């Protein structure tokens, strides 16, 4: 399942942004909406490139450019600065991709993770992504270069919002909360993606996937 998860790069005003993402079916990836659309300026980012199994600059399966991204209307209608309570439950995006430089599709190269809806709020999750710092803004070794994994039990934060304790910071956004993951076994279902953190606390927050979103 490690090959399903990768680093997402994209163009933002004045530079490049980074998030995490996961390959899903029909040659799409799932990530956080704030990695796609800025509610502060009502601005779509651009040039999204998903690199599954990214490792220290390496792209073993190639990179895949997004051809389209979809977010919830509720996210696009938000304005102002991000708030975990009231915003996280809309913070998800799905993007379709073209082929890599070898002409291969995303699903041909890495397969895809399953998705799970309407699960209970309390679950044991594996949280994955490419953070460059921890929740205290302390830089991690080889920041953003390697996939990191944390496991913890989730809890209900607000309606359709989950929380769990992991010491990951920026760059983890969009990474999957996975159920049924096991190393070296091709299994796992995405039930949330990383949305926000509280600096100084070992907490991550994410949308709870339901049949309504």
Language-model segments: residues:
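Conserved catalytic-core segment of clan PA serine endopeptidases
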Residues: 1-3, 9-14, 45-103
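Catalytic histidine site
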Residues: 3-55, 148-158, 165, 210
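Extracellular structured ligand-interaction cores
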Residues: 3-5, 16-20, 26, 45-47, ...
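Acidic glycine-/aspartate-rich tracts in secreted/extracellular proteins
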Residues: 35-37, 54-58, 99-103, 131-133, ...
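Short, solvent-exposed aromatic-acidic interface loops
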Residues: 36, 66-76, 132, 167-170, ...
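Chymotrypsin/trypsin-fold serine protease catalytic domain
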Residues: 86-165
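Catalytic nucleophile loop of clan PA
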Residues: 167-193
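C-terminal cap/linker of serine protease catalytic domains
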Residues: 191, 197-213
């Amino acid at each position: 399942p490690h090959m399903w998860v990768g680093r997402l790069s994209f163009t933002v005003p004045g530079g490049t942004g980074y998030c995490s993402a996961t390959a899903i079916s029909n040659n799409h990836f799932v990530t956080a909406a704030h990695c796609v659309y800025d509610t502060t300026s009502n601005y779509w980012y651009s040039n999204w490139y998903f690199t599954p199994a990214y490792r220290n600059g390496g792209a073993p399966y190639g990179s895949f450019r997004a051809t389209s991204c979809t977010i919830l209307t509720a996210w696009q209608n938000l304005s102002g600065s991000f708030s975990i309570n009231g915003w996280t439950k809309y913070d998800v995006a799905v993007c379709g991709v073209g082929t890599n430089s070898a002409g291969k599709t995303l699903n041909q190269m890495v397969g895809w993770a399953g998705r799970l809806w309407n699960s209970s709020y309390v679950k044991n999750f594996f949280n994955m992504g490419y953070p460059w710092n921890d929740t205290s803004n302390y830089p991690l070794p080889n920041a953003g270069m390697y996939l990191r994994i944390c496991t913890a039990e989730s809890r209900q934060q607000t309606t359709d919002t989950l929380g769990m304790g992991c010491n990951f910071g920026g760059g983890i956004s969009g990474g999957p909360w996975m159920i049924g993951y096991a190393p070296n076994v091709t299994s796992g279902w995405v039930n949330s993606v990383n949305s926000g953190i509280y600096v100084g606390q070992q907490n991550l927050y994410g949308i709870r996937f339901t049949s309504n979103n």
